[in-house]
Amino acid sequence: MNPIRRRKIEAEAVRTVAMMILSGKVKDPRVHMVSVHRAEISEDGKNMKVFVTAICTDKKKIKVLSGLNSASGLFQATLSGKLGLRITPRMHFLWDEEYIQSLDESLRLTRKPTNTD
């Protein structure tokens, strides 16, 4: 798949999923307060990883991912309609550990050292 086309599909997937969650089109109660960070489509265009985070506990994280994965058909149908795709990538939702690590690193770097003297 053309890299430019791939980036366009990935960007539209992020927009579509975020918009559908925010607008309340996803009725699953497990899916709320979710941030969609990025998407990565496979070379053949058949699979897509969508990376998300939410403010929740580890137990709740599993429920959020389960809710998103159960609603993946709705997201795929909407994305296919928007982009007119012949092959709609199968969406797999994953927790974005890389984003969380970068936030932790940023917080660590911005903290002011405390003087105990």
Swiss-Prot record:
Main location, first listed in the record: cytoplasm
UniProt keyword list: Cytoplasm, Ribosome biogenesis
Keyword hit for Cytoplasm: yes
Keyword Cytoplasm: yes
GO CC list: cytosol
GO BP annotation list: maturation of SSU-rRNA; ribosome biogenesis
PROSITE patterns: RBFA (PS01319)
Cellular localization per UniProt: Cytoplasm
Gene Ontology terms, MF aspect: ribosomal small subunit binding
Top-level taxon of origin: Bacteria
Signal peptide: none
InterPro entries in the record: KH_dom-like_a/b, RbfA, RbfA_dom_sf, Ribosome-bd_factorA_CS
Role, per record: One of several proteins that assist in the late maturation steps of the functional core of the 30S ribosomal subunit. Associates with free 30S ribosomal subunits (but not with 30S subunits that are part of 70S ribosomes or polysomes). Required for efficient processing of 16S rRNA. May interact with the 5'-terminal helix region of 16S rRNA.
PANTHER family: RIBOSOME-BINDING FACTOR A, CHLOROPLASTIC-RELATED
HAMAP family registered for this protein in UniProt: RbfA (MF_00003)
Recorded family membership: Belongs to the RbfA family.
Quaternary structure (record): Monomer. Binds 30S ribosomal subunits, but not 50S ribosomal subunits or 70S ribosomes.
Protein name: Ribosome-binding factor A
Organism this protein belongs to: Leptospira interrogans serogroup Icterohaemorrhagiae serovar Lai (strain 56601)
Gene (UniProt): rbfA
